[in-house]
Amino acid sequence: SQMIITNEIILGEDQNHLRDLRNELMGTGTYIQKAVEYLTEKGYTFQDTYTSTFVDNPTTWDIFAASTNTDAGIIGPTFDYLFAYDAEGVMQPRMAESYEISEDGTVYTIKIRPGQIWVDSQGRKIADVTADDWVAAAQHQADLQDCYDLNNFIAGMTEYLTGETTDFSTVGVKAVDDLTLQYTLKEPASYFISLLQKHAFLPLCRSYFLSQGGAFGQAEFAEAQAQPTYLYGTDQNHIAISGQFLCTNMTEKNSITYVLNENYWNAANATLKGVKYVFSDSSDVSRTYDDFINGVTMTLGLNTQRLELAKQKGDFDKYAYVGDVGRITFLFWFNLHRQTYANMADGAAPSQKTDAEKSVSCAALQNAHFRRAIGHAISRGAYLAQNVGEDLAMMSVRNTLTPGTYVKLDEDVTIDINGTATTFPAGTWYGAIVQAQLDADNVGVKVWDEK
């Protein structure tokens, strides 16, 4: 809802000015207004519908079963978070109004915004939003065996996942009353509130889920999911919606259309009133490029092919700019103790290696020097250049697995850095703390830049 959408392509120099303006006004609450004023002065006009592309049909409309960025991106507009960062990086209340933290830092009591409702894809009321919807969501994720974030933080979740208990009331997600939600953590995490804009902390309408053939309990859910009567998340017409948009049309490999949910809690103040995705698998480079230039779509990432096309047509110097690096990292893993050499489910696709070759590979991978040699031998810049070209290759290189903007402190925190008590104020990003420790260790590695 805080998107600024122009009818014209914004020039690269104006994009750079907007980025500098945002950095200057961070935390003041005035960036959106000032950005609109600047763009208006530059002759830009505005619209309220955002158009982008999708590369594949969603495999599910159950946000908690979504395992790809494509699925999550398509389902995302139909949900809203308890809290979320605004355009200036300030955490703002959304479906929640406020929160309190216990003295020991392990219990977060969250007040849910009253008057919110669940609707179907046509905007018809299904039920009131209550705190129990977050309890239902947590259990559904556990039943799906897909709750990494919850298991890391929430007390009792591990015991439920492993089957040590089947009683979900022992897990630290509780509805104190209809509008009071409570999370109990395994241990204090001063950045916990900043995690609440992750999908793991979205709600699920319990009554609607059950009406679509769902069930709670790991064994019960597995049985229900296998039945033809299980319909939840099979398409956009079989989910309950609490977010800003209704998906009114989904045409496979063609288009997806969203309109404003008039029952959304902040609909009256929404400046973004529509979203449309058009299909593009990027196989036709010229078409994808021309769609952007002609205003059919509003964003275009440059890979090596598009970069060359932009330079040929004289658009690169005019429109290109380097956007903010995202919050997702991609990495290589070593399988140090490989035990399986075929598909676990059915034994298909067995490895062709001999037992001797398997033994040699295992020994090599357990050698730290071998692993380091591979790590140093791989040029991340050269790898990225294959997709984005030499000029932009190093822009996306990170030296930490977890992005520096992953979480930020909700309160002042003092920690020990090599024997010195060091206080970081509320609002400090994770990356700044890591950099402070690295600097104290004289490591000489850059992982965080305040800019």
For the regions a language model picked out, list residue spans one by one.
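N-terminal lobe/hinge region of extracytoplasmic solute-binding protein
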Residues: 32-35, 50-104, 240
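Extracytoplasmic/periplasmic ligand-capture domains
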Residues: 1-10, 87, 113-146, 244-387, ...
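Beta->alpha turn/N-cap motifs
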Residues: 54-58, 187-189, 301-307, 387-390
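Surface-exposed binding/hinge segments that line
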Residues: 111, 133, 143-221
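N-terminal hydrophobic or amphipathic helices and topogenic motifs
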Residues: 1-51, 85-92, 435, 442-448
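Gly/Pro-rich hinge or "lid" segments in bacterial periplasmic/extracellular proteins
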Residues: 87, 188-189, 197-276
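A structural "hinge/loop" feature
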Residues: 50, 54-75, 95, 122-127, ...
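Immediate post-signal peptide segment of exported/extracytoplasmic ligand-binding proteins
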Residues: 41-51, 241, 268-273, 368
